[in-house]
Amino acid sequence: MSRGVPPFVLLLMLSLLAAPVAAQQTHILVITGLSGDPAFAEEFHTWATTLLDAATDRYELPAENVTYLAEKTDADPARIDNRSTQENVEQAFADLAERAQPDDYVLVLLIGHGSYDRGESRFNLLGRDLTAKDYA
């Protein structure tokens, strides 16, 4: 079922990694939400790891600049840092805010399903789903 990473995602990543200023660093946070189906879970993981492999292997982004949260850590325990819950997402953003400097590049990629209710969009996570306001 995997169709690879959408080309616009790779293009965005390449533009962030291609020619950073010497003092600048790139940080990547990838969050895969609830899959709802094993086939989607596999596809989300493939998209996430394809992007992360390109960043770390091809563009030599340091592993400490990468955070990957997913629905199930047992899908790839060596690479998935934690489960994609509200608490872990908030902690990942707090950690990123501590590490990233003002001129650094930060890429946050949300892979998954969303919902829309009463005028508010949400990204589906384990537990409470987060809104755009939660990510601001």
Short names for language-model regions:
Residues M1-R3:
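N-terminal secretory signal peptides that target proteins for export/translocation
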Residues V5-P6, H45, A78, D129-L130:
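A generic membrane alpha-helix/interface feature
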Residues P7, F93-L96, Y135:
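Short, charged beta->alpha transition segments
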Residues P7-A19:
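Bacterial N-terminal signal peptides
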Residues S115-A136:
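Cysteine protease catalytic core and zymogen-processing segment of caspase-like enzymes
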